[in-house]
Amino acid sequence: MKNLFRPLIVLFVVLAALTGLAYPAVMTAFGQAVFHDQANGSMLEQDGKVVGSKLIGQQFDAPQYFWGRLSATSPMPYNAQGSSGSNLGPTNPALLDEIKGRIDALKAAGTDMSKPVPVDLVTSSGSGLDPEISPAAAAYQIERVARARKLAPNDVQALVDRYTSGRQFGILGEARVNVLQLNLALDEMKRG
């Protein structure tokens, strides 16, 4: 009986060391060496201070900033610990109220409402934390942001164009604009 347990214990210790220590250590070292930025959360800095991550949206509701998608993590917007979809179906009155509330906020901020509102400005994403909007949603807000910052709309459009990322590998997903990066660039533009 003793001979039966010894190989099991040795196998357990070896596999635990391989899968619990060696493999995670090698993968961590590889990630830090090859994908340092991504392995550390894709953090963005301004003036030497971390202001956010490229991967998680932030709440912007002042007229001088581009607004991202609605957050589905209430009562604390963009709370990564509470990430989940809103689970509001198209017939749910709460979804309609949420959309109407965002449209009212866009109106109150002085957005030109003569054009159709891009859907990603009035709905939340699947995770509720999406940091990006479509180029159409960014273009929809250019006049408001330019007016609030006393900038030429063409200058703001050029900034949006510079921060628009195309499809991944040319085929995956859609073009998108990272709201935090764009707003940080706007703040830098104001300083410069």
Curated annotation (Swiss-Prot):
GO terms of molecular function: ATP binding; P-type potassium transmembrane transporter activity
Any Pfam family: KdpC
Record's GO cellular component terms: plasma membrane
Transmembrane domains' residue ranges: 7-27
Main location as per UniProt: membrane
Keyword entries, A-Z: ATP-binding, Cell inner membrane, Cell membrane, Ion transport, Membrane, Nucleotide-binding, Potassium, Potassium transport, Transmembrane, Transmembrane helix, Transport
Membrane topology label: Single-pass membrane protein
Localization in the cell: Cell inner membrane
Superkingdom assignment: Bacteria
Keyword Ion transport among record annotations: yes
Biological role stated in the UniProt entry: Part of the high-affinity ATP-driven potassium transport (or Kdp) system, which catalyzes the hydrolysis of ATP coupled with the electrogenic transport of potassium into the cytoplasm. This subunit acts as a catalytic chaperone that increases the ATP-binding affinity of the ATP-hydrolyzing subunit KdpB by the formation of a transient KdpB/KdpC/ATP ternary complex.
Protein family per UniProt: Belongs to the KdpC family.
Summary of subunit composition and partner proteins: The system is composed of three essential subunits: KdpA, KdpB and KdpC.
Protein name: Potassium-transporting ATPase KdpC subunit
